[in-house]
Amino acid sequence: MAIKEIKAEEFNYSPFRLIGKDWLLVCAEADGKANAMTASWGGMGVMWGKNVAFLVIRPQRYTKEFIDGAEGFSLSVFGEERRKMMSYFGSVSGRDEDKLAKADLTPLQDAGRM
């Protein structure tokens, strides 16, 4: 699957659909380890002239520890054909297994891109 970079000013998708129906995959890396989870609560917009995305993540979630310890995080969108994988990321804890490896995903670090 190829990565498609979309500049924020060219982002022409409904955040209501992406977050509420299609879901997002949020991934963060801290201390040499990465973890991801399905995110379905949040929003996108502009605050004080800056493009922003925000997520609401329960404090008990293992992924929140990664986000809190990281300089940033990534948001990815996958097509309907990956719905089962997205459901897996939302139902299994990274405390128990390496979800990225099991889903055959490799995190790429490329700061400042969407």
What positions do the PLM features span?
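Active-site-proximal mixed secondary-structure blocks
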Residues: M1-M114
